[in-house]
């Protein structure tokens, strides 16, 4: 296994006469370092350039001489968190390749590192047989900041800096030999914000969260798509980019070239003499902090099946304290044997609540009504475990609802000010209750969409594929992290695309696995009907959505398929050893006109836990009951964009 050579660069303290100071870049670097240390298992050569040390020459030298030490089989990572900028291209060679007529650059503390020069430096490292990756969390374009609570990572163009930088720039080879994960498209700004009081780049926060939850063998394409979904919670104006994105290329290789990758074994429950019972799974594996999460003892796969282990199958332990690498637990109504070690699987997930802020400067009565409705949104008219009021957006967690009451309406907004839903009326007490019901509904939907299993023995065993109907070649996410499916043109107008949705069991031997396919729509619905509410798929076999009939992707019936119109779906595959009760995964679309109390999801999630239990009744597939319920599980998510072409 090779070594990871990492150069992490973060700049908060820019010259005041050149750039606006930032606050989250050093936090990005610190969090990236923590993840790398955990992921590489000691095979890490780390260099950091922070604030005043991050000059143009030191960054370029760091890539050449620090990352340049890497040898074939090693991995080189360049991470930059700071300002970006752009300027009209003036060099003839640049004009030949800059279709927009503009050059982009990283803003170092004393000048600019033009992206073309950066590309050459990284490709020179990759030319030696080194797996090379760059993560850039900065702007490559301007534009007005759209969210009062976000800071733009963009520096105004400086002609003197660009003139000096352009002279040093060379034209990189095509195609690039390194993989790039960038915070934005070329025409978009990049932002930073605060999460639980700590500043981070929106992209860095989303990417690091996706990596913590990802399997050790997750590819750049998979990680990029997961980060894109996470970032969408905070901003619709910033779209991360993956390059090059061609199928079968470097984008489909494991992150960091697979360094540190291994097939995860089942998590184990054992006793520590000092701290008591613990499971070797913690926040570093993607487990959310806080109590409530549960594990259940599963049947051992090894020949060493002691009577104590077998008798304990199906027993539960509940998390008390979640640490980075382990979780202290309390047995639920049973007493494990002190000398025994039990394999366990995650059976109930305490998903963090959404944060809510209220703003109604001209309507104190609306503030009181909304505050009351949110405080009584839980079971029996009490607090909901899904919602948490915070005083400032800066104190919020990843999912933030900014409620602004104005003009007799409640606006439910993201961090960047974009709306989650259309404005809701706010004329009376029942309207405030409807706003609270909306927040609970949106929270449940986001918890389902963003559900990721910690590394599991089932990871990679089954693959979800989407292909054009009649084709054997699966589609892959593009540079925006989405599979794009476009309407065709028929005699009567636009024709919706037809696709085949397939679930392949990649193993040739072993056990069959239970597969549930969720369709999460951008109307905030979740249903499991594409794959019959769940089925077993045997080794070497393939399951087909709708019994191998075409799946039509289309706009909702009430929307006209005009050029440029689009909808998004997130297809989430949940793979388990045994059958899974899918009731907690059903969610009707959000309908502001539906009577309050008609949405059946409220009681299913009264305790704020997402449970992985066996169904009350067995499926139509006859088979012996699986002891211990669904057992080990894994997830895969594919984001699909169905659009009407503009021309």
Which positions does each model-derived feature cover?
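Short glycine-rich His-centered loop
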Residues: 2-21
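Caspase-like (clan CD) cysteine peptidase catalytic core
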Residues: 3, 53-81, 85-150
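Caspase-like cysteine protease fold
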Residues: 6, 171-172, 187, 214-276, ...
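Active-site-proximal C-terminal subdomain of hydrolase catalytic domains
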Residues: 10, 29, 115-237, 520, ...
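Short beta-strand elements in bilobed, periplasmic/extracellular small-molecule ligand-binding domains
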Residues: 41-50
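Beta-strand signatures of extracellular beta-sandwich domains
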Residues: 77, 296, 514-518
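Secretory-pathway glycoprotein ectodomains that are cysteine- and/or Ser/Thr/Pro-rich
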Residues: 144, 351-647
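Beta-strand/loop-dominated core regions that host nucleotide or nucleotide-derived cofactor-binding catalytic loops
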Residues: 263-280, 285-353, 526, 531
């Amino acid at each position: 296994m090779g070594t990871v050579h990492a150069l992490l660069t973060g700049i908060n303290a820019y010259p005041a006469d050149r750039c606006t100071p930032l606050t989250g870049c050093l936090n990005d670097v610190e969090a990236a370092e923590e993840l790398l240390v955990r992921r590489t298992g000691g095979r890490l050569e780390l260099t950091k350039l922070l604030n005043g040390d991050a000059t143009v020459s030191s960054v370029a030298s760091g890539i050449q001489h620090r990352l340049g030490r890497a040898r074939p089989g090693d991995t080189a990572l360049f991470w930059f968190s700071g300002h970006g900028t752009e300027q009209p291209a003036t060099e003839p060679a640049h004009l030949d390749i800059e279709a927009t007529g503009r050059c982009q650059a990283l803003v170092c503390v004393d000048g600019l590192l033009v992206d073309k020069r950066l590309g050459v430096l990284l490709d020179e490292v990759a030319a030696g047989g080194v797996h090379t990756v760059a993560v850039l969390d900065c702007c490559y374009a301007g534009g007005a900041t759209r969210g009062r609570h976000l800071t733009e990572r963009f520096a105004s163009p400086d002609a003197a800096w660009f003139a000096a930088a352009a002279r040093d720039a060379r034209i990189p080879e095509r195609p690039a030999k390194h993989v790039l994960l960038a915070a934005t498209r070329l025409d978009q700004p990049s932002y930073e914000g605060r999460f639980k009081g700590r500043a981070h780049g929106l992209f860095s926060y989303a990417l690091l969260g996706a990596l913590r939850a990802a399997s050790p063998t997750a590819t750049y394409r998979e990680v990029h798509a997961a980060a894109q979904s996470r970032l969408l919670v905070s901003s619709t104006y910033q779209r991360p980019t993956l390059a090059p994105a061609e199928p079968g290329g470097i984008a489909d290789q494991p992150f960091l070239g697979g360094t540190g990758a291994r097939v995860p074994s089942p998590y184990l429950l054992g006793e520590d003499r000092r701290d008591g019972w613990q499971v070797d799974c913690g926040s570093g594996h993607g487990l959310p902090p806080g109590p409530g999460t549960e594990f259940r003892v599963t049947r051992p796969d090894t020949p060493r099946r002691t009577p104590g282990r077998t008798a304990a199958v199906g027993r539960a332990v509940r998390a008390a304290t979640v640490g980075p690498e382990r979780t202290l637990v309390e047995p639920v109504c049973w007493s494990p044997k002190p000398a025994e070690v039990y394999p366990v699987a995650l059976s109930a997930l305490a998903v963090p609540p959404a944060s809510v802020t209220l703003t109604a400067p001209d309507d104190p009565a609306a503030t009181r009504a909304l505050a009351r409705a949110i405080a009584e949104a839980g079971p029996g008219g009490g607090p909901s475990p899904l919602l948490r009021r915070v005083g400032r957006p800066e104190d919020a967690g990843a999912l933030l609802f900014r409620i602004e009451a104005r003009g007799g309406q409640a606006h439910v907004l993201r961090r960047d000010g974009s709306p989650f839903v259309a404005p809701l009326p706010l004329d009376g007490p029942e309207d405030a209750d409807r706003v609270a019901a909306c927040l609970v509904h949106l929270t449940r939907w986001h918890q389902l969409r963003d559900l990721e299993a910690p590394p599991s023995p089932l990871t990679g065993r089954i693959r979800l594929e989407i292909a054009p109907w009649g084709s054997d070649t699966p589609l892959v996410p593009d540079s925006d992290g989405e599979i794009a499916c476009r309407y065709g043109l028929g005699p009567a107008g636009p024709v919706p695309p037809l696709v085949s949705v397939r679930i392949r069991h990649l193993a040739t031997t072993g056990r069959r696995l239970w597969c549930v396919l969720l369709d999460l729509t951008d109307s905030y619905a979740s249903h499991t009907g594409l794959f019959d509410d769940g089925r077993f798929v045997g080794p070497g076999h393939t399951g087909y959505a709708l019994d191998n009939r075409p799946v039509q992707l289309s706009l909702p019936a009430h929307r006209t398929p005009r050029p440029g119109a689009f909808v998004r779906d997130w297809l989430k595959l949940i793979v388990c050893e045994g059958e899974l009760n899918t009731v907690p995964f059903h969610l009707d679309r959000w309908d502001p006109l539906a009577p309050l109390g008609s949405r059946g999801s409220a009681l299913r999630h009264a305790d704020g836990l997402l449970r992985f239990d066996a169904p009350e009744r067995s499926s139509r597939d006859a088979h012996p009951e699986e002891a211990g319920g669904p057992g080990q599980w894994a997830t895969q998510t594919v984001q699909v964009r169905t659009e009407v072409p503009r021309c």
